[in-house]
Every structure is written in C-alpha cells, then in structure tokens.
Amino acid sequence: MSHNPDAIAPHGGQLVNRIATPEQREEFLSKADFLPRVQLDDRAVSDVEMIAIGAFSPLTGFMSQEDYDRTVTEMRLANGLVWSIPITLSVTEEVASPLQEGGLIRLDNSRGEFIAVLQLTQKYNYDKTREAINVYRTDDVKHPGVQVLYSQGTVHLAGDIWLLQREPHPQFPTYQIDPSASRQLFKDKGWKTIVGFQTRNPIHRAHEYIQKCALEIVDGLFLHPLVGATKEDDIAADVRMRCYEILLEHYYPLDRVTLAINPAAMRYAGPREAIFHALVRKNYGCTHFIVGRDHAGVGDYYGTYDAQYIFDEFAPGELGIVPMKFEHAFYCTRTKQMATSKTSPSRPEERIHLSGTKVREMLRRGELPPPEFSRPEVAAELARAMRIEVPV
C-alpha cells in the first residue's frame, strides 16, 4: 500500500494530542476531590481545548516563562520556532500562592465541571504593559485584547495539560472537525493544496470574491469561522453558521469546500494574530492562508495591510504555510462586479467598499444589506435574526 502523506507537516513537526486516555481519565477522576482547583474563564477553556486537539501544536500546555518571554519580545518559542501569541493561564496571587510546582491542578470550567488537569511546572509574574505594547501594539484599555489582559491575574501557571474528554460541541457537533480529522478529510478528498480562511463575520461579497480567487489556484477551501469568545457586538455564532451554510449551498462548489468551526477565542491582536491564525490552520492541514485587509484587527489600531507586512519578517520555511495576500475588494459599479484596484479601472466614487463592520452597522440600524454587500439569501437570514422586516 502506498503511503499518502499529509499535504503539510504540523508546526514543529508533530501533531500534539493532549486528550487523556480512558485510563488516564479514570486516574485523574479518582484524584478529583484531592486536587487544588483553578476555575477557567471561557477563553482559557477554549485554549485548553485547542492545545489538547493539536491546533496549537507544538504547545503541550500553558507557556513557561522562557517561551512566554521570547514570544512577547521576538515572536518565537524558546527553541526558536515561530510563535506570535502568548498562550498562558493567568491567576491572582491569592490563587497561585498555595499551588505547589510539580503538583497536579484540577481545571474547572465556569460551571464548576472538572474538564482538565495541569501539571504545574512553573509559577511566574509578568509585565502586562510590556505584553500589551508588544503583542497588541497599544496599551489602550479600550482595545478588547488589552482590556482582557489588564483584567486578568498577575501570575502565570505553566505546564502540560490533559483534557479529560473531548465533548461534542453543544451547538455545532457536525462541524467540529479537529486537526487530525481535517488532515484525513483533505487526504480523502485528494487535496494537495488547501487554503484556510479565518472569519468572525458573516461572509460578505468581498470575502466571497477573495475566497474564489484563491480557489482558482488551490484544490480546496477550508472555511474556518471562529466560534470561541468574541466581542459583544460581533454577530452570534449560530447566525453566522446559518449564513455560511446558505452561502455554500447556493454559491460555492460543495466538493471544493469544507466548513468547520474554530473553537478558539479571538484576541484582536491584528498582525500578530494573523501569523497565529496561519500557524493554527497549518496544524489543521492547510498549505495556504488568506490574509485580507486589517486581519484580526479592531478599530483603528492597525494599518490596513500591517497583517500582510508582518509575514515578510519571516523566511517562508519558518512559517511553513503560504500567505495569500489580497487587497481590499469592493463592488465596482462601472463593471458591475467585485474587483480590487488591481483589476478595476473605476474611479473612487464608483467603488462600494464592504466590511463586516458596515454590515453589522446596517443591521443595527434596521437596514437590509444591499446585494452589492451580501447575497440576498444571506441578507434575509441576517434580517430574520435581527428581526428586520424583509421586503417581499
């Protein structure tokens, strides 16, 4: 039998699996009442999940001080491997004080359920302002990522984790495809080149345009919307998923697209998060990754194409995934189609610029996005969710 290799190796060379075996799980559960407890917020829960399924490979747990410091200052792990976002577990001094390095810690979710174990190897303090300036390029507390950073505890707990059990996603079990499964799926489809697309918004016409431009070049599209923690004004995940389903059914070749959920939390770290998103999609088996305008940005904290420029700071082999950089797409009223400044002869007044923010603003005003912004079926679904009257 011929060996059918993955299209791309995971980051660091090996896909991490930190889901406890049945035997490990039984052992941990038998100790549950005797272990010190740390309660996780929703973001930490999603981080545990992403580590356990290998999406954050090569991480096997929460970062040591050496990995953390180098990630913050150089976008690398202690071993030199590219990594741009700190993955840490923060607690207060009060919580950290009695915890013994070398011991096991029970990790509970917000409902008090025992979901994971941490082998505590290190406790360390860190400089929040340094992290804010380096990772988010600002220490403005209005920035949602900085706001989370400044509200969390002052001590990091480091060490390997074990997720007790992989539970089906409560809302989208059909679309819960872990990295090991997505890699197998791509092999089964015979895809050698796969482009990943990260989104936290319903797909508007500009997104559709750049996805299809990419799909002209590669074998398959991995549409990977984020369903972890986002900002309060982001559109709810269940609404977005219905929009993706409708869009794929009507406007995409279904044999060339895979839709799956990304259970990670959004950091809004702009350029650094673009690198992070690319590395995560590499772990899912993608060979290419779409980077559009202001990727993972928020407000006016980052330049339009800063998230593209940051890829130039690394040698291609260091990342191991190819960024596909697209200019800001718009609807051209002269040619009656989607375009960018590379392909359209139009004047500025003939260009309708689209964004998820504009779509959200229109919906909040009770307005239906026009066909130049969103496909009619998607606009109707958004309107229903926002209780906007849809004209017959």
From Swiss-Prot:
CDD domains: ATPS
Pathway(s) annotated for this protein in UniProt: Sulfur metabolism; hydrogen sulfide biosynthesis; sulfite from sulfate: step 1/3
GO biological process: hydrogen sulfide biosynthetic process; sulfate assimilation
InterPro entries: ATP-Sase_PUA-like_dom, PUA-like_sf, Rossmann-like_a/b/a_fold, SO4_adenylyltransferase_pro, Sulfurylase_cat_dom, Sulphate_adenylyltransferase
Keyword set, alphabetical order: ATP-binding, Nucleotide-binding, Nucleotidyltransferase, Transferase
Main EC class the enzyme belongs to: transferase
EC number: 2.7.7.4
Pfam families: ATP-sulfurylase, PUA_2
Similarity comment text for this entry: Belongs to the sulfate adenylyltransferase family.
Gene Ontology molecular function terms on file: ATP binding; sulfate adenylyltransferase (ATP) activity
Protein name (Swiss-Prot/TrEMBL): Sulfate adenylyltransferase
SUPFAM superfamilies: Nucleotidylyl transferase, PUA domain-like
HAMAP family: Sulf_adenylyltr
